[in-house]
Design a protein with these regions (language model features):
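Loop-to-transmembrane helix entry/capping segments in MFS-fold secondary transporters
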Residues: 44-45, 119, 150-162, 389-401
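A late C-terminal transmembrane helix in Major Facilitator Superfamily
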Residues: 390-422
Length: 456
């Protein structure tokens, strides 16, 4: 097997630059979905069910993108056609989703599963957005696995983590920024504010421009080059030589696949609770949002201001991740760096339940950012190193996405039930802040599980 060549900084940068735009879209979704669906009429106990869709689409789409991109060889490349198609669909959906409440759909009559027509439309748009973002996101991880040697992978994924967090900062601050320049942050009942709508519009434009940049700057290897650098016999692709099913590949997966997956379970369940309940936690603890009908009043100015502040907090988290991503490559012990990062994040989550000062929450989210940076960088470095020379890199990375999606699905299903089981908060509403304590406990459990990883 021929050694993969070293790439200069800009070569590694170009491989992942489109990820910046994809992450803006992902950040807008993460920070605003609970806010959007609460505005459309969802109650806090059902919010977690809307969060089933993102991981569900991920667990379906990403393995398929991995499997079929492993088999794709065309003039535009191997992975790039999939990321471009996904980005194009995402752009269209990002222009529709935040307008769900403005399309004159019925917002009072329950039509299916306790949802109104406007909520069903929003759910359909969310499903399409999740599908397209997953299709655009996965190829960037595969490009690094395909083209970067083992020595540079940690650096490549750190660059990807930096771009991911930089994109997150941009996406998270958009609603706050647009409100600051005078775009309305309130709207009639059932309608999403213009500050959020315009955030999605601008995010969509940046997404497609960034993806176009990567498609122009990156030349994927042809089949002969790929085979030579990945130890596959010449004359046939890895799929033609050996085309096992996904179940067979799972059974043959290295031990690291499963041990890393255990850590992933705790981490991603924790982050799902963060995305679902941060809006309610911040609105209740830091902005004294009034109560209406036994729950936080989502039409109040306090709730919408809190929603913008959540974007700022997520941006602080992303900035913390950017800084921490430059530090973790210097920690010699991979397991120690990984575990320490998750412990810091767990402390950040637990503190959220007790902090009432909006600015003091910056500390909580900086700590959470440490865990986020590690979750983006370490698992794929460890896994792709373990898979080196085994072939089917794209399929394995797609299957590994199950360790991201399944925990979120479990957390989304159980989230509402756990919230109902908790005692009410002092204001008489659902105790969303205590969900942050549970998230912190999960991250610390993940930190302990790191030491079970069988690394190459």
């Amino acid at each position: 097997m021929k050694q993969k060549p070293n790439m200069n900084f800009w070569g590694l940068w170009n491989l992942s630059f489109g990820f910046f735009g994809v992450q803006i879209a992902y950040a807008l979704q993460s920070a605003n979905i609970s806010r959007i669906f609460a505005t459309l009429g969802a109650d806090p106990h059902s919010l977690s069910f809307f969060w089933i869709l993102p991981p569900l689409m991920g667990i379906i789409v990403q393995p398929l993108v991995g499997k079929y991109s492993d088999r794709t060889w065309c003039r535009w490349g191997r992975r790039i056609p999939y990321l471009f198609l996904g980005a194009a669909v995402a752009v269209a959906v990002m222009c529709l989703l935040p307008n769900a409440g403005s399309l004159q759909l019925d917002s009072t009559t329950l039509v299916w599963g306790g949802m109104t027509a406007v909520m069903l439309f929003g759910l359909l748009m969310l499903m399409l957005l999740d599908t397209s973002i997953n299709m655009a996101m996965q190829p960037f991880k595969m490009l690094v696995g395909d083209m970067v040697n083992e020595e540079q992978k940690k650096k490549a994924y750190s660059i990807q983590s930096f771009l991911c967090n930089a994109g997150s900062v941009v996406g998270f601050i958009f609603p706050f920024l647009f409100t600051w320049i005078g775009i309305s942050n309130t709207a009639p009942e059932g309608v999403v504010p213009d500050s959020v709508i315009w955030s999605f519009y601008i995010g969509a434009a940046i997404l497609i421009l960034c993806v176009i940049y990567t498609t122009v700057k990156v030349r994927e290897w042809n089949p002969e080059e790929y085979n030579e650098y990945n130890g596959i016999e010449s004359g046939a692709s890895e799929e033609e030589k050996d085309n096992p099913g996904m179940v067979t590949l799972l059974l043959k997966a290295p031990t690291a696949f499963w041990s890393i997956g255990l850590v992933q379970f705790f981490c991603w369940a924790s982050f799902l609770f963060m995305w679902t309940y941060t809006n309610g936690t911040v609105a209740a603890n830091a902005f004294d949002t009034p109560i209406s009908g036994g729950e936080l009043d989502v039409t109040s100015d306090a709730y919408q201001v809190a929603g913008n502040w959540v974007g700022i907090l997520y941006a602080v988290q992303a900035l913390g991740s950017v800084v921490w991503a430059t530090i973790i490559p210097r920690i010699r012990s991979t397991k120690m760096g990984y575990s320490l990062s998750l412990v810091l994040g767990g402390v950040g989550f637990v503190s959220m339940a007790f902090v009432t000062d909006p600015y003091l929450l910056f500390v909580s989210f900086i700590l959470i950012g440490c865990a986020w940076a590690a979750t983006l960088a370490y698992p794929f470095t460890l896994l792709t190193n373990a898979l080196e020379g085994k072939g089917h890199m794209g399929t394995y990375l797609g299957l590994f996405n199950g360790t991201i999606c399944l925990p979120q699905i479990v957390a989304a299903i159980l989230g509402g039930m756990i919230l109902k089981a908790l005692p009410l908060a002092e204001n008489g509403a659902s105790n969303q802040p205590m969900m942050m304590v549970i998230a912190g406990i999960l991250l610390i459990a993940g930190a302990v599980s790191v030491f079970a990883i069988k690394a190459k």
